[in-house]
Amino acid sequence: MAATRSILTLSSIRSKAVIYTFLLMDKPDGGALRQRVRPEHKAYLARVAERMAFAGPLVSDDGHTMLGSLLAIDFESRDAAQTWLANEPFTVAGLYASSSVHAFVNLWPQKAGFAPAD
């Protein structure tokens, strides 16, 4: 009997919420703005904490200079993810020079965060 191979696609997991990744790069010299808006940003993130796989700043090789943010959050749709980003305090304050949002399928076992998709 020939083995059948299952191919995982975004449409095959649509019945579930999807993890969306946010790659958000700061404008040059955005450090002061980032620090000023950070309390609002953290409060906004706390509202989706139960759906968050991970979140944190992107830093330069010195380990301290913040360059942007990388987040992975579970949303029901791309529209919901985009709306969430549009209202995110760093976005509203104009911190980001660029942003991209992508659906993410976790296929690698991990010890924390979201379980891999089947």
Roles of regions detected by a PLM:
Residues 2-118:
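Conserved, structured core segments of small domains
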